[in-house]
Amino acid sequence: MSAVKLEAIVCHEPDESELSHLSDNGSKTKNGVVFQLLDQKSSEHRWFSERFLRWRRRYLPVDGDNRRDHGSVKQSGPLVSGAAYCISSCSMIILNKIVLSSYNFNAGVSLMLYQNLISCLVVAVLDISGVVSVEKFNWKLIRVWMPVNVIFVGMLVSGMYSLKYINVAMVTILKNATNILTGIGEVYMFRKRQNNKVWAAMFMMIISAISGGITDLTFDAVGYTWQLANCFLTASYSLTLRRVMDKAKQSTKSGSLNEVSMVLLNNLLSIPFGIILIILLGEWRYVISTDVTKDSMFWVVATASGFLGLAISFTSMWFLHQTGPTTYSLVGSLNKVPISLAGLVLFNVPLSLPNLFSILFGLFAGVVFARAKMS
């Protein structure tokens, strides 16, 4: 499951614009529902996480003796949950990069399908064991959700291919374009006014992306094209999800749709699309014949990336419950720093001084954007 899922549900890293828009409207909250990979699964992670916080406060109040017990771990809660969220999101991107580049695995759609299958199986097991509750699906709900899922699949696939061709640091910086597209979409679709600080931060993001591309010693036109497509699809997913949510709730018997159900629905509906793409692109021949799939460590890494996709979803919910939208958004922005540095070090990326400054400037622009959206 990509990091842009529940940033998130997979490859997808929630995006600051998504969370801040929802927090601006009081009761409207999110997931990551999960960048994107990171990011890919980023806007969804934050959106779902916000909604989980509302549900938690409403149905699981803390009082009496429970309040005293809760207080004893309150100080360590934010630190532990924040560390878990950062580690899982960083690990997700690094593992996907290892599978696609280090193992030279040329079947991004197949990897996405495998990760989503793992997510479905884990959620199903949790549902059967009574750990979570999943809404019963019907054809009306599936028809309403289908446009969102088509964009979701495109978001994950484009994220996989971009990560194969571009180094992790540049992927992280280019993902800032998602914030720009989402911010513009909010203006035209939801009539949401952006303050001058937000527009200034967006301009900084554009400068960092352009300068980063010009100074990138490993520049790959195919990879950059995939990443720009991913930014467009991630922003579209975030904006479309907001419009579809109310209709989706009305399509269920209970009149509600919790976050876990959304995770399962998105991943379950993506499986037929994944199978069709694998057949059309001929990936199944490659998967059967390549020596990579005969390597047991490859399957260990690929399976771990699938579990990490779900881990991002749940740790983002946990961290948001322990802190709040402001802290969550800032940590999400700052989390790009260790991801970028880890990507540069682990994969021995050729780096020039101008490109390094472009990356650092882009990371700074992301933090400025998060602060501006909350001001």
UniProtKB/Swiss-Prot annotation:
Expressed in rosette leaves, stems, flowers and siliques. Pfam families: TPT. GO terms for molecular function: antiporter activity; GDP-mannose transmembrane transporter activity. Disruption phenotype: No visible phenotype. The chain crosses the membrane at residues 79-99, 112-132, 141-161, 165-185, 199-219, 262-282, 300-320, 327-347, 349-369. It is found in: Golgi apparatus membrane. Keywords: Antiport, Golgi apparatus, Membrane, Sugar transport, Transmembrane, Transmembrane helix, Transport. GO terms for biological process: GDP-mannose transmembrane transport; nucleotide-sugar transmembrane transport. One of its GO terms (cellular component) is Golgi membrane. It is a multi-pass membrane protein. Its main location: Golgi. GDP-mannose transporter that may be involved in the import of GDP-mannose from the cytoplasm into the Golgi lumen. Belongs to the nucleotide-sugar transporter family. GDP-Mannose:GMP antiporter (GMA) (TC 2.A.7.13) subfamily. This is GDP-mannose transporter GONST2. It comes from Arabidopsis thaliana.
